[in-house]
């Protein structure tokens, strides 16, 4: 398979919290040994209560995000209510199962049943978990997640854990780096953290 327009080195993290979910990623997009892009967007708002992360083919990933977002909007129009996280993940799984793509995604958020995160592979395989990491630096990220995750963790606390996990990946994985993206979804909706907010947390971690 050609690696043209492909993220080969992504590291992403998703954490389920008692009051929402947290997503984090680094920003490097690599093609083989080339750092092709230093400010790649890897976290997407799907709806007010749903977000997703991507790794894989740029074209496939962007198309998938647009289709999922359209499906969630269509569901609201047809049913007069927001789609559940399980249903949104199932729709995404069906899309990938019927048309496999070179992409891996995390999808999660908050609905009437609480917070949840699902991992989807290129063929549509779907797994729900409390915390998940994908990509070339996931081994290093999982070390932090396994050590620092605990039941009933809050979004605020998980944000620092997620940044620590991505930081560990960028320090050891040559295909991950060039900054951080962090977002959360709570009952109040989707929020992407500003660079200054992320930098303040990193400074706290380093102190």
From Swiss-Prot:
Pfam families: Proteasome (PF00227). GO terms for molecular function: threonine-type endopeptidase activity. Its main location: cytoplasm. GO terms for biological process: proteasomal protein catabolic process. The formation of the proteasomal ATPase PAN-20S proteasome complex, via the docking of the C-termini of PAN into the intersubunit pockets in the alpha-rings, triggers opening of the gate for substrate entry. Interconversion between the open-gate and close-gate conformations leads to a dynamic regulation of the 20S proteasome proteolysis activity. Keywords: Autocatalytic cleavage, Cytoplasm, Hydrolase, Protease, Proteasome, Threonine protease, Zymogen. Component of the proteasome core, a large protease complex with broad specificity involved in protein degradation. Belongs to the peptidase T1B family. This is Proteasome subunit beta. It comes from Methanobrevibacter ruminantium (strain ATCC 35063 / DSM 1093 / JCM 13430 / OCM 146 / M1) (Methanobacterium ruminantium). The lineage of its organism: Archaea, Methanobacteriati, Methanobacteriota, Methanomada group, Methanobacteria. The gene is psmB.
